[in-house]
């Protein structure tokens, strides 16, 4: 069965079918060939059932909050804050780009939204200040992968939905890995800045200027604090937190900062609806794909095959990192998690890997795949925003991908990187 599903799915992608149809093509064709029209109808019913979930409501709400923040000029305030903190370093705008992505991650949780919002502001500014266009696009794409790692994160919500893990535990587990990716990118930027004599963006800001920038960014920076604080304090669930984030974003954009007016709302709602509908359709299709694959006993066959490769968990973790990294190049993280997590998760949990630890290994690998040549999605977004050819961006991003791979191995072989914070807050007991 696996020999049928995989080639049909890959062929559908190669001929240009959207991923949604590709995920339905293989099981649909199989059921049609077997003359099982009732099961074929059940397949498409599973698409609806896959989206009909209360926890998944958090995804469109968080996306709407991110769009509200972006349309409300919040991105500009975050960039100004980052520039006041780091603009005076050599290679300052590259550092500003990375720090802005880390801050924006707490608002949107999306790599594509990060690339579009931060890139449209900083890539032209970086080019104007003497950076090459390909480098500017590459650092934007590389830093955008922080978005789905630092909470709130759409892919963590999907993982929780599929595997039954605590969303709060997954959110907390992503904090240190996300910060490590950001610090690693800053280190590589510093090395390159010394070698290639990158320009300094601004003179050192005074404490007064930093204070002013901090005040302007105060309300946006409070968004992740409110979300995580409310969840950890038991005030609301992660799904309710997403609705609170929308209400908070709406109030500060319309009434506090007054950076939006009521007539902007239809455009904001339309943009958020279109973005979230794409994600939810992929989730529904992936759930239908997973259902048919499970009926064919493919997961059990694949699990047995993986265990024949080695009995050493460290070697298996290395191999699974490689697999997930490759999958992330071609398939969006959400559908990949829905399809692969139920197959791979139990294998490694039985080998002694903590469920939350494996969730972060999987999520970070698939997220970094978004920025990996030749098919990484954010490379196409960065190319569109910057006007630079994908081939040039792909070459320029390689040093940053090397850093992100190092962080992946740190996460994999040092469990405390992902487990320390959720254990501290009591979401993980023992193990």
Feature roles, as predicted:
Residues 1-431:
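Alpha-helical transmembrane segments of multi-pass membrane transport proteins
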């Amino acid at each position: 069965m696996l020999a049928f599903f995989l080639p049909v799915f890959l062929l559908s992608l190669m001929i240009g079918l959207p991923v949604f149809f590709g995920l339905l093509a293989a099981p649909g064709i199989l059921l049609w060939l077997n003359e099982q029209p009732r099961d074929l109808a059940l397949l498409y019913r599973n698409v609806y059932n896959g989206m009909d979930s209360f926890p998944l409501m958090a995804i469109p709400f968080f996306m709407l909050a991110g769009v509200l923040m972006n349309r409300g000029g919040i991105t500009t305030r975050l960039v100004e804050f980052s520039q006041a903190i780091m603009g005076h370093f050599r290679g300052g705008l590259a550092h500003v780009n990375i720090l802005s992505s880390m801050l924006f991650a707490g608002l949107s949780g999306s790599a594509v939204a990060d690339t579009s919002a931060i890139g449209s502001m900083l890539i032209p500014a970086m080019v104007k200040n003497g950076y090459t266009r390909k480098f500017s696009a590459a650092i934007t794409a590389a830093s955008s992968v922080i978005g789905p790692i630092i909470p709130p994160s759409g892919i963590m919500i999907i993982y929780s939905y599929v595997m039954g893990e605590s969303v709060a535990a997954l959110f907390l587990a992503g904090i240190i890995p996300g910060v490590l990716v950001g610090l690693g990118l800053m280190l590589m930027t510093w090395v390159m800045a010394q070698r290639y004599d990158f320009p300094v963006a601004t003179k050192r800001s005074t404490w007064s200027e930093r204070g002013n920038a901090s005040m302007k960014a105060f309300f946006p920076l409070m968004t992740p604090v409110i979300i995580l604080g409310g969840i950890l304090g038991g005030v609301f669930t992660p799904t309710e937190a997403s609705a609170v984030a929308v209400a908070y974003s709406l109030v500060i954009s319309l009434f506090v900062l007054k950076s939006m007016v009521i007539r902007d709302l239809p455009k904001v709602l339309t943009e958020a609806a279109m973005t979230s509908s794409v994600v939810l359709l992929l989730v529904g299709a992936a759930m239908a794909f997973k259902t048919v694959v499970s009926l064919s006993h493919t997961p059990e066959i694949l699990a047995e095959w993986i265990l024949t490769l080695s009995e050493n968990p460290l070697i298996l973790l290395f191999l699974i990192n490689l697999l997930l990294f490759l999958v992330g190049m071609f398939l969006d993280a959400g559908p990949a998690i829905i399809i692969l997590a139920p197959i791979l998760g139990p294998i490694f949990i039985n080998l002694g890997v903590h469920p939350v630890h494996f969730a972060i290994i999987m999520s970070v690998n698939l997220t970094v795949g978004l920025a990996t040549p030749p098919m990484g999605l954010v490379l196409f977004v960065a190319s569109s925003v910057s006007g630079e050819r994908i081939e040039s961006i792909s070459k320029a991003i390689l040093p940053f991908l090397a850093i992100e791979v190092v962080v992946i191995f740190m996460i994999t072989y040092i469990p405390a990187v992902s487990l320390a914070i959720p254990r501290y807050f009591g979401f993980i007991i023992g193990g």
